[in-house]
Amino acid sequence: MKLPIYLDYSATTPVDPRVAEKMMQFLTLDGTFGNPASRSHRFGWQAEEAVDIARNQIAELVGADPREIVFTSGATESDNLAIKGAANFYQKKGKHIITSKTEHKAVLDTCRQLEREGFEVTYLAPQSNGIISLQALEAAMREDTILVSIMHVNNEIGVVQDIEAIGEMCRARGIIYHVDATQSVGKLPIDLSKLKVDLMSFSGHKIYGPKGIGALYVRRKPRIRIEAQIHGGGHERGMRSGTLPVHQIAGMGEAYRIAKEEMASEMARLRTLRDRLWNGVKDMEEVYLNGSLENGVPNILNVSFNYVEGESLIMALKDLAVSSGSACTSASLEPSYVLRALGMTDELAHSSIRFSLGRFTTEEEIDYTIQLVRKSIGRLRDLSPLWDMFKQGVDINSIEWAHH
């Protein structure tokens, strides 16, 4: 077993060796290096064929028509293109958008930008289990609501939203529904031929494909229109200009092909490992599970260890690559906005750790993790005056701290 142990698969994944091998075929002179938009010679045709194959592989995993898949530079761009693109195109129908407070920053910051441009956005608070109440969503819908953006799986706590029911509600009212599926694709079955979802964002690097490539599903029946955000050449049916990076697209296609084949067995294995990890730490004092084991993806476990500071815990766990909050926001020392939105105290949110497991996680690594966590928590609590006070029965919330 090699240290440190990587348990941050929700931040990114290593490229699967099969994917890396596939990508190598599209880089050098002796490979298929052409521009897929070059229509006048074989180099271009072969590159275009590789893109078509990948587009089909992605469409097959999610039950879409390949013509509904638009390649982007990643899920962040897909979220931007979907939300800004739909808002700009349909703004004559209304300027109201609904999303949730626990979305990824790529959705929240995009909505904030649209607010600056004159749109109105309702940010729904989830219930304490992380799920958006369908009644609250319905109550927020108005005559001028044009777009709802609610993710499939949350990147911090792994809870799964009922995108099927939300889709039905939106379709019945003629509202466009966008789903960020970055954390669910390849982990949960998605069938867009049955779901009433109009726009869906995908990433390559969260399921063992390369970074810097993603896709946006844009429904054809009923036809959804979006306004392009990047212009120049009219690639990707006019929705996203720019020379297609064939090596990255082929890599993403291969990653999605592998996911389709291995998803069922891989998720069963990860569920066993995640449950093993939780069972190994849940009997400690003041340990809380954030999210839900029943209604969550099998690869994410978010746990709060009360009376232990998250930052010091991460330092103590230096042999584990884990995160507190998500990588996109962990550069700041603010407690996780997702956990705060669940109604958690700052202290408890600050003491949370996200363990995310993946294809190369082993049972041996999980057992080592359990031992290390138990040892580290014990040591940090021995050093903590707050833990002493808690053990003596002092109500810490009632203490008035001196302001120096």
From Swiss-Prot:
Pyridoxal 5'-phosphate binds at residues 75-76, 155, 183, 203-205, 243. GO terms for biological process: [2Fe-2S] cluster assembly. Its main location: cytoplasm. Its cofactor is pyridoxal 5'-phosphate. The keyword Nucleotidyltransferase does not apply. The keyword Thylakoid does not apply. Transmembrane segments: none annotated. One of its GO terms (molecular function) is cysteine desulfurase activity. It is found in: Cytoplasm. [2Fe-2S] cluster binds at residue 328. Its EC number is 2.8.1.7. Master enzyme that delivers sulfur to a number of partners involved in Fe-S cluster assembly, tRNA modification or cofactor biosynthesis. Catalyzes the removal of elemental sulfur atoms from cysteine to produce alanine. Functions as a sulfur delivery protein for Fe-S cluster synthesis onto IscU, an Fe-S scaffold assembly protein, as well as other S acceptor proteins. This is Cysteine desulfurase IscS. It comes from Serratia proteamaculans (strain 568). The lineage of its organism: Bacteria, Pseudomonadati, Pseudomonadota, Gammaproteobacteria, Enterobacterales.
